[in-house]
Amino acid sequence: MVNMGAIVPVNDMVGGVIVKVTDEFPGSKTLIKGKTVTLKGNDAETFVRERKDVGDGLNDNRMKRQQVYEVAFKQAFYKKCNENKKFPLEVYNTLQDYMTTNITAQQFSKLAVLMASAKADTKLTVKGKEGFDDDGWQTFTPDKDSLKQVELELFYKKQK
């Protein structure tokens, strides 16, 4: 498990992550809607975590930004791995203060390179209804058929 405090240091280790900003970020002088920016420092964390004051304030937009960030981060990470074969080990060492794991540095390095080189052409989405409860908290009620499809895709293999 890696906690959210790792976003900034790991983002900056890859030299920043290039994304197009698709939401308004009130109060930010660097995250400007419509601009392509290189996320550095706290801007990276703001981009992936902020919700309430950004765009429509709903979680769906934040999840879309997280997907955009994930794809761009993987590209930057993979590039760094190709430039420096020890880069995954450097990331592992940096993450020590932010993670709890039982995998070794060598295992992490192998997994990190696999993750970075994996094709992100398949995204699974559970459809459903968004709303708010009586206390004003955002809710999501998954469509049962959509949820079942995602479960089958993730956890089962088709027989041939």
Describe each model-derived feature in a short phrase:
Residues N3-V10, A44, R65-Y69, F73, ...:
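Stable alpha-helical elements in mature extracytoplasmic
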Residues A6-F87:
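Flexible, polar/acidic helix-loop-strand segments at domain edges
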Residues M1, V19, T46-F47, T122-V126:
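Structural recognition of the beta-strand scaffold that forms the well-ordered cores
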Residues Y98-K160:
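C-terminal solvent-exposed extensions
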Residues N3, D23, G128-E130:
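A general secondary-structure junction signal
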Residues G15-V17, K35, G41-A44, F77, ...:
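Generic structural motif recognizing short loop/turn segments at the entrances and edges of beta-strands
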